[in-house]
Structures are given as C-alpha cells and as structure tokens.
C-alpha cells in the first residue's frame, strides 16, 4: 500500500491541483460510501477510513467529476 501523501499527490494531479474541487469530490464520495456504496478499489470499509478509500479512488481514476455531478 502506498503512503497517503503519495495517494493525495496523485489525486491532486487528477483534478489539475484544484484542492477545492478535490475536497468537493471527496465529500460527495465519502457521503456515498457512508450510505453503503461499495468501494471501487480493493479496500475494506471496516479496515480503512472512508477518506482514504475515496482519495484512493480519485488517485486511481475510478471517480470522475461527471460521476459526482450526477448526485
């Protein structure tokens, strides 16, 4: 598993270093995960923080802004 700093760096690169946009995407995805959505990455919800799961999903390109806009 990569360090969270590396994952956060990759996630920021995915959103063109827009921290505000990243925060909004993470908030929306964490809300989905807390309501029972399945993680799009191989991470156990019981072992990892929802923030870490959402950040990893963004870093790996599993979550796009267009998906969040549909909420």
UniProtKB/Swiss-Prot annotation:
Its EC number is 2.7.7.6. Keywords: DNA-directed RNA polymerase, Nucleotidyltransferase, Transcription, Transferase. InterPro entries: DNA-dir_RNA_pol_omega, Pol_omega/Rpo6/RPB6, RPB6/omega-like_sf. GO terms for cellular component: DNA-directed RNA polymerase complex. GO terms for biological process: DNA-templated transcription. GO terms for molecular function: DNA binding; DNA-directed RNA polymerase activity. It catalyses: RNA(n) + a ribonucleoside 5'-triphosphate = RNA(n+1) + diphosphate. Belongs to the RNA polymerase subunit omega family. Promotes RNA polymerase assembly. Latches the N- and C-terminal regions of the beta' subunit thereby facilitating its interaction with the beta and alpha subunits. The RNAP catalytic core consists of 2 alpha, 1 beta/beta' and 1 omega subunit. When a sigma factor is associated with the core the holoenzyme is formed, which can initiate transcription. This is DNA-directed RNA polymerase subunit omega. It comes from Wolinella succinogenes (strain ATCC 29543 / DSM 1740 / CCUG 13145 / JCM 31913 / LMG 7466 / NCTC 11488 / FDC 602W).
């Amino acid at each position: 598993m990569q360090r969270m700093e590396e994952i956060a760096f990759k996630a920021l690169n995915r959103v063109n270093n827009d921290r505000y946009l990243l925060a909004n995407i993470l908030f929306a995805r964490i809300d989905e995960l807390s309501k029972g959505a399945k993680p799009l990455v191989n991470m156990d919800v019981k072992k990892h923080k929802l923030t870490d799961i959402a950040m990893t999903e963004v870093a790996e390109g599993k979550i796009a802004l267009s998906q969040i806009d549909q909420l």
